[in-house]
Amino acid sequence: MKVSELMEALNLKLLTEEVALDGEVKGGYASDLLSNVMGQAEPDMVWVTMQGHQNIAAVASLIGLSAVIVAGDAPVAEDTLKKAELNDVVIFATEASAFEVVGKLYELGIGK
């Protein structure tokens, strides 16, 4: 599934501008502990979190994640979005809880 298709299927709000939405989503990972994400997530996964600080952009770029979904209507700092855009990291937001997002990803066939 393409990132753009995921955005449409989950009705996600795109927070980053001028980023590529044609990447593949090959799996998913959910955690708010950055070291856990760095040790367990794999390239081309989508990451579900409630973190909004700029380190999420750094971790996503380092791993090569397809996108980050910030759940629960959690705030995302402006410096996070700037850093993400510089590194072509897609960041979405949703009012849905992390639990709901993960369930929807599973229903779409996105899993490890």
Over which residues does each language-model region extend?
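N-terminal first-folded block
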Residues: 3-45
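Feature captures the catalytic cores and cofactor-binding loops of soluble hydro-lyases/lyases
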Residues: 23, 34-46, 50-112
